[in-house]
Amino acid sequence: MKRISFKVEDELARNLDKYSMQNHLTRSEAIRQILREKLSIMQIPTDKGKVVSGIIINDEIYECKYCHTRYLSHTGIVYHLEREHNIKKPFSPHIIKIVGDKNE
């Protein structure tokens, strides 16, 4: 498993119990909350009512041209196109790339 970052992990380890007690959270809820604050974990609604959540890494969101499902990674959209729409070796005409605005 890749390490997130030393700074976030150290802060998480040091402050977890204190944070969970102050905010009346369980340990797992406290971990999620700290990571959400530190890593910009987003939930992105799609036109079909599905919600995609994940860590925004480079401000890019990939949307399927056919069903408008959104993914936070290029790999995710490629797998989606192969599985759902039976498109072998998907390339850019099948993908709408949204760059920049996290509040999209």
Swiss-Prot record:
Annotated keywords: Metal-binding, Zinc, Zinc-finger
GO biological process, one term: regulation of DNA-templated transcription
Disulfide bonds: none
Highest taxon listed in the record's lineage: Viruses
Chain intervals annotated as zinc finger (C2H2-type): 62-85
Gene3D superfamilies tied to this protein: Met repressor-like (1.10.1220.10)
GO MF annotation, one: zinc ion binding
A Pfam short name: RHH_1
Name listed for the protein in its UniProt record: Putative zinc finger protein ORF104b
Source taxonomy: Viruses, Adnaviria, Zilligvirae, Taleaviricota, Tokiviricetes
